[in-house]
């Protein structure tokens, strides 16, 4: 086992603090509407320019192992806030730095770190309650657009697109962000359920011009296994022919005799039919077929249920208003499933999202949720160069999460003002001893850090701004860094989602508390590079 370096007490905290400062100083220049850009060198390709705090944080790796530990802990704050709220990463970093700095001073002067942490936790709890109490609910489309615009650093086009997307697909719908092939940014909305499987044979096409299959008011046969022979299918095909409606078959695969017969029937005009492969793989495929069955009011035919294909009746088939099948995807519009059953399935998927620990699983579950609940909106981000597109895409991602968070928990005045105002909640919080009281006052000072940093990035003096804002007791009154004016921030459209501010403060306090209570640090010793031995026969004697 390699030898380790161990640092104790103030030496450990000092090294750690240096790492915290390096990372936080690089991230905090991006805060606010007049935040600066950070250029990141890439091992291949052009450098990346970004104003996204978490992107900067993820790129920083320090040579000194102990300093790096401090930096990585702050990076963890940025990542956690990003996961929870999708925005507010820079605010969280600024708050962490402020709490750790003050906390380290208090510990160095002989205070009990555990009591300091208890004081910090009490203060944070009180502030979070105050923030929730003063939240405004989001009702109008304009407000959603404003949140998006602010999070996208004042880009109104992004705010507008996000508001439109949320209006179309609802709060549960999925909004995906892609890079456009052109310089224009555009929005495309897919209503209904779409999955990434196309028609199994081009002979099924009904609309030659658009090269796609269009089925009006079809029946849907949802089958878990492969269909190869025709015999089991005959009873259901005959029933569908008599009803005069089209039929869509969704199965693991349709091949051989079954596929050939379906194609011949379609070409002769006896039966309007199409077949697609089932989406997903393994257990996920089963779940998705069940989703389609619930959405269309049908039954997923599987051997687990003991239903044989020969015994399937029309009542077991799903119904939809329309189905459109293209080469690579299928869209089911307006399924005939009952609202209650769909809602029950939605709640079930939400519970799974809460429980899962895997990011990949969570993403897939959210996709399923969206397909059931509303639809999918795709924002294609355009730009003149690849660097610009990537930078804009970062901002659209941030803005999208911020608008979601705003709809979920409501809005607060932005620009760091909400935290500053919430400090009055600390007047009623008392510590059990002197050290806890110091912990509370550390938070009181730290929550000024975001507004000071926003002012500094905009070229103003933080202390003067804080003083002027405090003069007026109105919760929404503050300073607009974009215009340099004072006034009602709600009216000016300078707003932050409660969830973002809350997550930033809670995550910052959590990690800062851990850093303050650290007494020892252990890291691998740097390996000494030994010179390679001289190869045999390379001596100097002839």
Swiss-Prot record:
GO terms for molecular function: ATP binding; ATP-dependent protein folding chaperone; isomerase activity; unfolded protein binding. GO terms for cellular component: cytoplasm. It catalyses: ATP + H2O + a folded polypeptide = ADP + phosphate + an unfolded polypeptide. PROSITE patterns: CHAPERONINS_CPN60 (PS00296). It is found in: Cytoplasm. Disulfide bonds: none annotated. One of its GO terms (biological process) is protein refolding. Belongs to the chaperonin (HSP60) family. This is Chaperonin GroEL 2. It comes from Chelativorans sp. (strain BNC1). The gene is groEL2.
């Amino acid at each position: 086992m390699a030898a380790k370096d161990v640092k104790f007490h103030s030496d450990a905290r000092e090294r750690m603090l240096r790492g915290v400062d390096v990372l936080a100083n690089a991230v905090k220049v991006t805060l606010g509407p007049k935040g600066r850009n950070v250029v990141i060198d890439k091992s291949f390709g052009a450098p990346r320019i970004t104003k996204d705090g978490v992107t900067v944080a993820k790129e920083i790796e320090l040579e000194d192992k102990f300093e790096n530990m401090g930096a990585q802990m702050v990076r963890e704050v940025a990542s956690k806030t990003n996961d929870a709220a999708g925005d507010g990463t820079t605010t969280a970093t600024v708050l962490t730095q402020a709490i750790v700095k003050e906390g380290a001073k208090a510990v160095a002067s002989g205070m009990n770190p555990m009591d300091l942490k208890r004081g910090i936790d009490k203060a944070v709890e009180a502030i979070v309650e105050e923030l929730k109490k003063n939240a405004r609910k989001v009702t109008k489309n304009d407000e959603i657009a404003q949140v998006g615009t602010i999070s996208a650093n004042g880009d109104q086009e992004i705010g507008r697109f996000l508001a439109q997307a949320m209006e179309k697909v609802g709060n549960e719908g999925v909004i995906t962000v892609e890079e456009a092939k052109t310089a224009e940014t555009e929005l495309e909305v897919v209503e209904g359920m779409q999955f990434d499987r196309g028609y199994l044979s081009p002979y099924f096409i009904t609309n030659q011009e658009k090269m796609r299959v269009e089925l009006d008011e079809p029946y849907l046969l949802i089958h878990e296994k492969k269909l190869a022979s025709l015999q089991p299918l005959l009873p259901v095909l005959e029933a569908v022919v008599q009803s005069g409606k089209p039929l869509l078959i969704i199965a693991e695969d349709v091949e051989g005799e079954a596929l050939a017969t379906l194609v011949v029937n379609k070409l002769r005009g006896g039966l309007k039919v199409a077949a697609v492969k089932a989406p997903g793989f393994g257990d996920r495929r089963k779940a998705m077929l069940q989703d389609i069955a619930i959405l269309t009011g049908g039954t997923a035919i599987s051997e687990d249920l003991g239903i044989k294909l020969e015994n399937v009746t029309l009542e077991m088939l799903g119904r939809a208003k329309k189905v459109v099948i293209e080469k690579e995807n299928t869209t089911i519009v307006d399924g005939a499933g009952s609202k209650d059953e769909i809602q029950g399935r939605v709640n079930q998927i939400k519970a799974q999202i809460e429980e899962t620990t895997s990011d990949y699983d969570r993403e897939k579950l959210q996709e399923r949720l969206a397909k059931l609940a509303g639809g999918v909106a795709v924002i294609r981000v355009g730009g003149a160069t690849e660097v610009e597109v990537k930078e804009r895409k970062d901002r659209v991602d941030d803005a999208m999460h911020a608008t979601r968070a705003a709809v979920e928990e409501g809005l607060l005045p932005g620009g760091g003002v909400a935290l500053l105002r919430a400090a009055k909640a600390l007047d009623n919080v008392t510590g059990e001893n002197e050290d806890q009281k110091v912990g509370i006052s550390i938070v009181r000072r730290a929550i000024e850090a975001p507004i000071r940093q926003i002012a500094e990035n905009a070229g103003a003096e933080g202390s003067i701004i804080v003083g002027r804002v405090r003069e007026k007791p109105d919760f929404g009154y503050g300073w607009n860094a974009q215009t340099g004016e004072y006034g009602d921030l709600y009216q000016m459209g300078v707003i932050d989602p409660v969830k973002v501010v809350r997550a930033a403060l809670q995550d910052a306090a959590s990690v800062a508390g851990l850093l303050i209570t650290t007494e020892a640090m252990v890291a691998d010793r740097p390996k000494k590079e030994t010179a390679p031995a001289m190869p045999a026969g390379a001596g100097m004697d002839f």
